[in-house]
């Protein structure tokens, strides 16, 4: 059978080609989304369960997917020898870097306003005076462009409502959080 100049055969090979095409398109969509935005702004897993199961010690070196950095920081509570946080999306690593810079340079109240509430009226000052110097050049560039996510006044416009997870939250939560 001919369609638009291509030879098309019915049966199993056609099913495999369609499945392959769907997989290809799925990967293209994933790559387009994942390579252009912060996907995870918080983690939903329970790393305490992992810590209990792994029984990490000071002799351990672990490899984790960075995601939003929450699990990486939780594993650090066990003080393993080294943690390697990797992610295909460098924006996730930029978020972990920002959190580490905050842990090192901010008091609890400022850190919690940033990452507990997702906003801080003085973010630009804190970023310029304290946080930025501890970031890689990629993370600096990323947060130079996206730091406004932490400067919003409206509860629906906090850091947690930006990036891909934030878009999903906006779409699924009809009412603003209080």
Where does each model-flagged region fall?
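Conserved class I S-adenosyl-L-methionine
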Residues: 58-67, 83-84
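N-terminal, positively charged/glycine-rich alpha-helical extensions of SAM-dependent methyltransferases
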Residues: 2-32
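Conserved SAM-binding loop of SAM-dependent methyltransferases across substrates and taxa
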Residues: 68-80
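Class I S-adenosyl-L-methionine-dependent methyltransferase module
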Residues: 9-18, 91-178
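Conserved alpha-helix/loop element of class I SAM-dependent methyltransferases that forms part
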Residues: 38-61, 74
């Amino acid at each position: 059978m001919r369609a638009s100049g291509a030879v098309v055969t019915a049966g199993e090979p056609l099913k495999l080609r369609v499945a392959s095409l769907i997989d290809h398109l799925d990967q293209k969509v994933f790559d387009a989304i994942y390579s252009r935005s912060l996907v995870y702004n918080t983690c939903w897993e329970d790393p305490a369960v992992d810590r209990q199961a792994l029984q990490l010690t000071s002799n351990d070196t672990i490899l984790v997917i960075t995601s939003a950095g929450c699990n990486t920081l939780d594993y650090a509570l066990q003080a393993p020898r080294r943690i390697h946080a990797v992610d295909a999306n460098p924006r996730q690593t930029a978020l972990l870097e920002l959190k580490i810079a905050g842990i090192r340079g901010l008091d609890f109240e400022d850190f919690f306003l940033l990452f507990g509430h997702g906003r801080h009226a003085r973010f630009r000052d804190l970023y310029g005076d304290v946080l930025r110097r501890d970031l890689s050049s990629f993370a600096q560039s990323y947060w130079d462009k996206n730091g406004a996510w932490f400067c919003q006044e409206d509860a629906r416009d906090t850091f947690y409502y930006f990036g891909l997870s934030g878009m999903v939250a906006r779409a699924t939560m009809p009412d603003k959080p209080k």
